[in-house]
């Protein structure tokens, strides 16, 4: 699986060099798999990873990898390449995204921000800034429903309504999607693929989303630096004050 221009920076640990890398989207066109989504399994699968602390790629599970690869998704990059992908989920604004964008700009780093309909409607200026500064804006659906729980037409509405709204406000065409809550099924992967999207999961995350667990900057840094690996797709939440504080250091 060739890397695409999503999410990019290199974080310096061990032998990983501290450089920035941008990979253009035209290295690999998004491939659409022709299939009847209604005939596919709708068993809900929650994305999960088995961490290690030796900076090697984690175990994502055979089912996860099989389905993500089959529908041309992304979970990790090439383990031989010394870079990582940086992604943020943007369900709502807690006041830290501006600082995150400032840090990325100061370090000449590009990232991917997966936004919801609520985020677009309430933070249109920040979304425009993301695009203007060269970041990728991805689809996290209008209402953040678990997609296996809704029917085909509702999935299409959740995805395409946000896509249309982003285009009308910014002229930007979204190509990447992250399933809300990390929950998916073979049916939902097929549907979003048929809508022209590449699904992006992750290979490193921690409980940064919990508002009650902020004020743990050393914990956050350790969770990232102890588990990072070549080709890593990092999931962070911009609602975390800790992430805004530690981003410049990690």
Task: Provide a role label for each language-model segment.
Residues 72-79, 107-108, 121, 242-250:
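C-terminal domain-boundary segment and adjacent tail
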Residues 4, 11-12, 147, 185, ...:
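Enrichment for repetitive, rod-forming helical segments
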Residues 2-87, 93-102, 106:
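N-terminal pre-catalytic segment of deacetylase/amide-hydrolase enzymes
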Residues 1-2, 175:
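Short alpha-helical segments used as structural interaction elements across diverse proteins
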Residues 51, 81-84, 94-96, 100-101, ...:
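Metal-dependent polysaccharide deacetylase catalytic core of the NodB/CE4 family, i.e.
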Residues 9-14, 20, 223-226, 231-234, ...:
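Hydrophobic secondary-structure block in the mid-to-C-terminal portion of proteins
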């Amino acid at each position: 699986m060739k890397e695409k221009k999503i999410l990019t920076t290199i974080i310096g640990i061990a032998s990983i060099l501290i450089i920035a890398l941008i990979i253009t989207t035209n290295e690999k066109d998004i491939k659409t798999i022709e299939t009847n989504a209604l005939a596919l399994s709708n068993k809900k699968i929650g994305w999960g990873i088995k961490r290690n602390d030796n900076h090697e790629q984690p175990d994502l599970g055979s089912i996860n990898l099989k389905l993500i690869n089959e529908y041309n998704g992304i979970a990790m990059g090439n383990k031989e390449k010394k870079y990582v992908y940086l992604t943020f989920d943007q369900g709502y604004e807690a006041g830290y995204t501006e600082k995150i964008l400032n840090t990325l700009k100061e370090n000449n780093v590009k990232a991917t921000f997966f936004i919801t309909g609520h985020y677009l409607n309430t933070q249109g200026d920040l979304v425009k800034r993301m695009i203007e500064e060269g970041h990728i804006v991805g689809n996290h659906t209008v209402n953040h429903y678990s997609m296996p729980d809704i029917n085909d037409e509702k999935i299409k509405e959740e995805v395409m309504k946000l896509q249309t709204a982003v285009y009308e406000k910014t002229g930007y065409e979204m190509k990447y999607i992250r399933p809300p809550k990390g929950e998916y099924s073979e049916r939902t992967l097929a549907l979003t693929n048929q809508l022209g999207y590449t699904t992006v999961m992750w290979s490193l995350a921690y409980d940064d989303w919990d508002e009650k667990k902020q004020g743990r900057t050393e914990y956050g840094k350790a969770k990232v630096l102890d588990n990072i690996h070549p080709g890593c797709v990092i999931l962070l939440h911009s609602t975390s004050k800790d992430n805004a504080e530690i981003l410049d250091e990690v």
